[in-house]
C-alpha cells in the first residue's frame, strides 16, 4: 500500500515556491505540514472539483506549474474533467492521485 506522507514528501522535493499546488482533503493537511506556501490552493468544500480548479488555473496561469494532489474518490466524482484536461493538454498541469 502507498504511504501518502512518503509520496507527498517525494513530490515536494520537485516543487518550487512558484508552483501552485492544490491538495485535497486528507492530503491537504499532510501537504501543509510538509510544504507550507502561500500558493497552496485549498479547495475544501468542493469535493470532486480539484481537477477542474487545477485545469482553470493551468490555463489561466501558463507561466506557473500547477500541481493537483487529488484523492481517488475526488477524482471519481468528476471523471469528465479528464476529458477536458486531455483536450486542453496544458503543459504546466501535473495531476497526482494520492
Please report, for each region that a protein language model flagged, where it lies by residue.
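Thiamine diphosphate
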Residues: 32-97
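Active-site diphosphate/adenylate-binding microenvironment
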Residues: 1-47
Amino acid at each position: 500500500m502507498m504511504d501518502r506522507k512518503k509520496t507527498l514528501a517525494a513530490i515536494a522535493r520537485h516543487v518550487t515556491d512558484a508552483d501552485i499546488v492544490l491538495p485535497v482533503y486528507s492530503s491537504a493537511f499532510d501537504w501543509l505540514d510538509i510544504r507550507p506556501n502561500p500558493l497552496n490552493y485549498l479547495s475544501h468544500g468542493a469535493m470532486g472539483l480539484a481537477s477542474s480548479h487545477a485545469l482553470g488555473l493551468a490555463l489561466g496561469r501558463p507561466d506557473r506549474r500547477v500541481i493537483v494532489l487529488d484523492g481517488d474518490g475526488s477524482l471519481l466524482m468528476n471523471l469528465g474533467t479528464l476529458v477536458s484536461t486531455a483536450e486542453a493538454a496544458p503543459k504546466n498541469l501535473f495531476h497526482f492521485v494520492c
